[in-house]
């Protein structure tokens, strides 16, 4: 940095850093790069690291740039199934478009929201469902079996199995009064509304 290069390349700069120090170093690195005003390309396989450090993120798969956008859009508005699979932050479920603002899935029922890309009514699509898209409700009559539960500090990530054997991830705040065990039934709040409907 002392030489003030026009372009700085950091290839997996934090890959060997212990997790307990990683976030602290990420924070310091972000401040240094911002203050230096040097254009920096950071190569990483950690999407969370890329989202935190980058003002723009590029997803490269099979030597091709699949998406280049701000971190929010890469996460919430992936432009291909390849990007969805690479990020591994949700699941794709079959659905049918029933109106300009709704679609139907045989397990979840009617889902409303804003389509990021228009589809003709009657189209068979794959709907991206991310962990934050569905909300827990113990009183709901729409219940699925819990097959996995991961504690992530501020939240749990539940994996639910639907009658059609689809696995759907759902976030629940860790302070929620009732935590569900494996094999228990988990209620999903209705009506289901997803702000950004992403389909392929």
Predicted regions and their residues:
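C-terminal boundary and immediately downstream tail of ABC-type ATPase nucleotide-binding domains
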Residues: 76-100, 128
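Secondary-structure boundary/capping residues
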Residues: 38-41, 92, 155
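ABC ATPase nucleotide-binding domains
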Residues: 1-82
